[in-house]
């Protein structure tokens, strides 16, 4: 791990948290973000990506930006004429921002320090227990979402370091950027696993209940349609019977 403070171009993300190990493509349209990418492409391709606390500010202030983010390597930049640029990055490591420089009219910068995540559980039994809890939660989540879990579980089982395991599982299951940021910012490895497993279980429960609600709605609609069909049949039958009575009276 490098304890050196490194000054990197900064991109604040709206509604997104990028984790170490993630490879992701996203659009950028703000002038400072585009300039940050251009600068990074000329200087080792590295940039500090951190989410804004809320997506609304176009130029967020210090208290509107999280302090924990991810140092990423830019893999590809596609410039779309008259539109946003598409940037593909790979998350390298977790870093904390010791200072933000937001006054520059062209580019925002962050003074970053890498966070040491090389440690983990000291007890292998505890590690394996937590990993099995997470894998079971991932399997339940995938089943509740209609997603095949085999490849995800197989990939998780190959990851040796504890933090990397958490980030991979988080990226596969949790979309909420604030949850991702909470997991990223948490230093204690057991707490990371707790937040992750609890969040995945909660998502699986939501998916299950969503299916229950959908099934209930479909049943009610089916009953209403059946009732409507029966009522229509009765109405038509009454009209036909009424028509026959009138004919008899005319005779």
Predicted segments, located by residue:
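N-terminal low-complexity, acidic/polar interaction/targeting segments
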Residues: 1-251
